[in-house]
Amino acid sequence: LPAFTKELTHITDDMLSFSPPASSVLPAFIEFIGSAILIAHNAPFDLLFINKELERSGMPTMSNKAIDTLNLSRWAYPSAKHHSLQYLANAMGIDAENAHRASDDAKTCRKIFLRCLKDTESVQKK
């Protein structure tokens, strides 16, 4: 892993050495998500990364639609100082203790998505 990624995520090369190769988990992942609309923070980045791994594994790329909570938060909270997942979680009082861990980030993203919907509900009704 690049030093920047290690610093940002606190994920080490040792941690990765115990992980199965992407090619062995991607089929189950693709089956799980099916044609669902995905919700992710900075969704284009995640989809690009996943599609590169799919290509590398000789699998078809995904074409799922996605809702990007980064863009959604920029629209819902234009005056927010930052729009990172961690910053938004802190500003909203959402516990995001284990940042940069897939399961925890997914739960945080879900909470931010629902909060954005709730906070913009009155705007949508106008």
What are these regions (language model features)?
Residues I50, L72, C109-F113:
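Buried hydrophobic packing segments
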Residues L1-N64, P78-H100:
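Conserved non-catalytic scaffold segment of RNase H-like nuclease domains
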Residues S63-S73:
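A short, structured active-site edge motif that brings together acidic residues
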Residues A91, R110-K126:
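Acidic two-metal-ion nuclease catalytic site recognized across multiple nuclease folds
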Residues T5, T9, T69, T108:
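Ser/Thr-centric signal marking residues that sit
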Residues D105:
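Conserved catalytic/binding loops enriched for acidic/polar residues
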